Amino acid sequence: MERFLHSQPQQIISQCLSANVLLNNIKNIEVYTLAVSSKSGWVYLDTDELSTKGRYGSVSVADKGHLVKSINLIEFKIKECSFIKIDVEGHEWEVIQGAESFLNLHKPVVYFEAKKELTSTRECIKWFMGNGWDCYWHFAFWYRKNNWRKHQDNIFGGTGDMNILAVPRTKIQPDNFPKLQSENELWDGDLYLKFYSDKQIPLV
């Protein structure tokens, strides 16, 4: 059975995830209350008060706040890794810097959040493209017509999150994602839609 390792630095969110895993009798997910960064140690999170309304998933590393333990990926002693998802609110480059030996050893497919205004996003793309991965854009719209509950009211407009799918060149490459030619390319939701419209293929 495949194992899924999940690292969530916010203790209460980690506890909620662990409770969901337990209540649904899922046996192949392991939840760790840890931050992942460039090195082992401790980091501060700008955690909001959970009694207020907000997006608790948008917490990021800060100069002060709640102190949590941090590790780098190589500390996960596993025999193989096929896929990694990184969503750490602008801290992606630090995670990748700390995971270089891990990534080069396992050559996983990596899916990470991209913020075009951040230099660190370009550093991530540059690293992957220079170390044997091809990179593709993926715009995750917050609303889709084929959503699970079939809601037709789109309250989000065209809002979504831009991400990068990095695939080792030794593996089969997707043909339904826009491929990057350079770390300096700047895509957005409109360009993403145009790619699928021009190619007349289903939106991913």
Language model region names:
Residues 1-204:
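Phosphate/nucleotide-binding beta-alpha loop and adjacent structural elements of enzyme active sites
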